[in-house]
């Protein structure tokens, strides 16, 4: 802020995904800086566009740099999305830790579980659309499909049911099996995006 007692939303407010990037950077113990990775690419690309616009033309080399920076920025933003999905797996894990003998520890235990799961699934669904994503590769598409399938359309609840379907075994068994799928999904996303394992566990 420039200290003028007002906020310029064009330059003094961090919106939407930039906040998630900053949270993941702050939560990293290995120096991950997704915010800088994205911002540097935006700034360089915009600088070249500004210069070429003023000049009235853009060279092939400049165009190639702009395209490269666009890909870098897009992939950095997607890393923020993936890291945030990973973060919500960890939040869901913490929520499940509070469930004992098929009972929530409190009303907030239930609301937090469902809120965190909804965030998780929403962010994970967002990994489908970037054409330069790791998951856009032919040999990776099935992995993302499996991750989304394993997350399901609702979390497993304290009674072991999921999306209105009762557990076939005990509630504890259903929750344990579901948690194993979520952790496997979390770890797979970590590998796909090249995140350090310690960050994946701690985000």
Q: Where on the chain are the PLM-derived regions?
A:
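Mature extracytoplasmic or organellar-lumen-exposed domains after removal of signal/transit peptides
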Residues: 1-203
């Amino acid at each position: 802020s420039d200290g003028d007692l007002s906020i310029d939303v064009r330059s003094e407010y961090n919106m939407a995904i930039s906040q998630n990037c900053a949270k993941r950077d702050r939560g990293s113990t290995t120096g991950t800086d997704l915010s800088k990775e994205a911002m540097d690419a935006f700034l360089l690309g915009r600088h070249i566009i500004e210069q070429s616009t003023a000049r009235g033309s853009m060279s092939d080399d400049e165009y190639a740099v702009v395209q490269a920076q666009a890909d870098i920025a897009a992939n950095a933003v997607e890393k923020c999305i993936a890291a945030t999905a990973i973060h919500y797996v960890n939040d869901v894990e913490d929520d499940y830790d509070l469930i004992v003998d098929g009972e929530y520890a409190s009303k907030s235990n239930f609301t937090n579980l469902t809120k965190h799961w909804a965030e998780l699934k929403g962010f994970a669904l967002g990994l489908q659309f970037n054409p330069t994503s790791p998951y856009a590769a032919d040999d990776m598409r099935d992995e993302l499909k499996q991750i989304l399938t394993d997350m399901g359309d609702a979390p497993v609840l304290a009674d072991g049911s999921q999306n209105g379907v009762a557990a076939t075994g005990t509630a504890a068994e259903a929750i344990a099996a579901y948690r194993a799928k979520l952790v496997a999904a979390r770890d797979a996303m970590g590998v796909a995006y090249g995140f350090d394992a310690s960050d994946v566990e701690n985000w």
